[in-house]
Amino acid sequence: KHFFYYYLYILKLKSNKMRKYIYPLIIFLFASKAFSHTSHYEGLKKIEMDVVRNGEVIGYTNYYFEKEDDIMTVKNYTKFKVKLMGVTVFSILSEATEKYENDNLIYFKSNTFQNNKEKYVNLNYDKSLKKFIIDGSSYKGEASLDCIIGNWWNHKIFTSSKQISPLSGSIKEQIVTFIGKEKININNKEYLTEHFKLKSKNQNLPDDKKLNF
């Protein structure tokens, strides 16, 4: 069994009565395989992730895989809440579907409620243009084929220079840094992990628009 972990930083959560807070979360991923190409996921049925804050599981993001001929379909269900003194300050409820043909993304659709605000993405591959066409809550237009969906199941997220937000469709250039291999202990069992950091290339973006994982 392979094991990975990611630090997810929510940089800015604001209300009229709140200061700026930083909430470190850890996403734990358990799977029998984890590779950089979709063809390597053959035989894999699901990847389950726990979202953990301060040692407590506060939600999940789970992926389910289906393969038929040359088409692989990935379905995602995500739900978690961050609470401060009993008050929910950040929440995600999301469903998404990705489709790949011969390892190439051809379709993506998601519906998300982030802090009860609705977001969405509809993406299709245009064969004549050889580009992605995106209709999203934050972006509508074209995207080059070197963009990937910013979902954690796909190891390509660590090799790509651009990602498409799975929540809103916005395109962000990113810088990926491999921090190193680390050993962590969970439930009295030791795991060798790989620790990466993802940041937005454009540091002039507002904090709530930046990548900082």
Give the residues covered by each predicted segment.
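Aromatic (phenylalanine/tyrosine) cluster motif
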Residues: 3-9, 30
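Boundary at the C-terminal end of the N-terminal hydrophobic targeting segment
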Residues: 34-38
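Positively charged n-region of N-terminal signal peptides that target proteins for export
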Residues: 14-21
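Gly/Pro-enriched, hydrophobic low-complexity segments
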Residues: 75, 91, 193-213
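N-terminal mature ectodomain segment of secretory-pathway/periplasmic proteins
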Residues: 45-127
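Solvent-exposed helix/loop surface patches that form functional interfaces
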Residues: 42-44, 111-205
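Sec-dependent N-terminal signal peptides
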Residues: 21-30
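Polybasic, lysine-rich low-complexity intrinsically disordered segments
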Residues: 1, 12-14
